[in-house]
């Protein structure tokens, strides 16, 4: 999936943030089958960028194109189909349902990725298999983060958006998660855009941008 930004500026964003950014108000292309790291301090627009790419925010100027098509021309139904089949995201706030079990949250995905390992295999790799039948509200934030990651990886995608996916993981669990992500990116022939506050995970990135 090819993503192009042509002088995109979200509202509202301070002028000094825009001027110092590698992304805002520039011409930028996230190429197919590439891995991009977006690094910045809090409040610089990392989550905003991923929300724009996922189509849940449309308050911006400039042109955002997906595979050559202006995103402003996409209908609600177009976006639903894109999210169902082509783009997967792990939100910074995870967006899990606390009253459901970890497995029930994962199984909310309407279409499974035929290239992905089974849920139990991914959960075992991330060390959360024993928690799958617990309510999310009984899990630690690090455990919840891994549940949300499995949910993002279990659906089909050509583009994977990860918003600070390791913020509550120790080095060992971050390494396990990075390995799983790398494997799924390769199997899917997909692109990755990952945001971080500064730490660089064990993933080979083709481009690094500063907001």
Predicted segments with their positions:
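Helix-to-loop junction immediately C-terminal to a conserved catalytic motif
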Residues: 54
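ABC ATPase NBD coupling module
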Residues: 71-88
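Q-loop/switch helix immediately C-terminal to the Walker
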Residues: 93, 99-112
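Conserved ABC ATPase "signature" region
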Residues: 116-131
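Conserved ABC ATPase signature
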Residues: 135-139, 143-145
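Hydrophobic anchor residue at the start of the ABC signature
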Residues: 149
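Catalytic Walker B motif of ABC-type/P-loop ATPase nucleotide-binding domains
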Residues: 160-164
């Amino acid at each position: 999936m090819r993503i192009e930004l042509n002088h995109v500026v979200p509202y509202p964003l301070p002028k000094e943030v825009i001027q110092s950014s590698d992304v805002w108000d520039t011409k930028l292309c996230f190429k197919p089958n590439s891995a991009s790291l977006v690094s910045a301090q809090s409040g610089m627009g990392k989550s905003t960028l991923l929300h724009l790419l996922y189509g849940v925010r449309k308050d911006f100027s400039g042109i955002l194109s997906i595979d050559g098509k202006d995103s402003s021309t996409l209908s609600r139904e177009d976006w639903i189909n894109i999210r169902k089949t082509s783009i997967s995201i792990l939100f910074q706030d995870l967006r899990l349902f606390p009253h459901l079990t970890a497995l029930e949250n994962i199984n909310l995905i309407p279409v499974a990725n035929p290239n992905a390992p089974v849920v139990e295999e991914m959960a075992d790799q991330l060390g959360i298999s024993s928690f799958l039948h617990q309510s999310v509200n009984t899990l630690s934030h690090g455990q919840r983060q891994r549940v949300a990651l499995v949910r993002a990886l279990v659906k089909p995608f050509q583009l994977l958006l990860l918003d600070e996916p390791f913020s509550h993981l120790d080095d060992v669990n971050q390494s396990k998660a990075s390995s799983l992500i790398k494997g799924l990116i390769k199997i899917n022939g997909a692109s990755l855009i990952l945001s971080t506050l500064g730490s660089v995970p064990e993933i080979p990135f083709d481009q690094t941008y500063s907001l």
